[in-house]
Amino acid sequence: CKPFAGEVRRLREGVLAFASEPLHLLVPHKNAVNSLKSTRCHVRSAPLSCGSFVRVGDDLLLGSPELCFAQMAASLPFVSLVKLGTELCSLYTLQPNGSAGYERVLPPTTPRALEAYLGRCAGMRGLADARKAACLVAASSGSPMETALALILGLPLRLGGYGLPRPILNHRIDALQSGPNAMERRYYLCDLYWPEARVALEYDS
């Protein structure tokens, strides 16, 4: 069915009050496309893979982080797609005004979940790039600058990075609690950590 102005307004005043404009809607055929300035319709007649949607109400499904990543592969440059994937797997949020929030306890998705979802997909523009990009996504970034640093250091040389092994972000290291070298804190989180080299890197901390 075609989304009507009243339905869109009700969603914008309720569960989707946080969303920026235009509101992107997925419709099954061209006849369902509306002309509302506050929305942008995308036509998809073929079935989508399991895990494409998250139910947030009796009559509302939101595209999952995995579906968002797959769809954005059709329009984003490759490195920007890797960055988006890392943000979807991060511990922070990005607001429409560009500011970051740090209230997440768990990331919306993981690199493994992205790869698994993309492996089930078919017939989507940019799918090959999405699968390649998912292999470069880092998990659990704690800030936009940690994401930027992980990409700069970990991306291959051909993509503008330094080609280092992909680091573990916000890795926990338990501290000694007794003896002459006992630490005040029970554990520390390393912004970037390379376990094979036993090297940790902190950004501005």
What are these regions (language model features)?
Residues 104-205:
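Surface segments flanking catalytic/ligand-binding clefts of nucleic-acid enzymes
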Residues 1-125, 147, 157:
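Short gly/ser-rich loop at a beta-strand->alpha-helix junction or flexible surface loop bordering the NTP-binding
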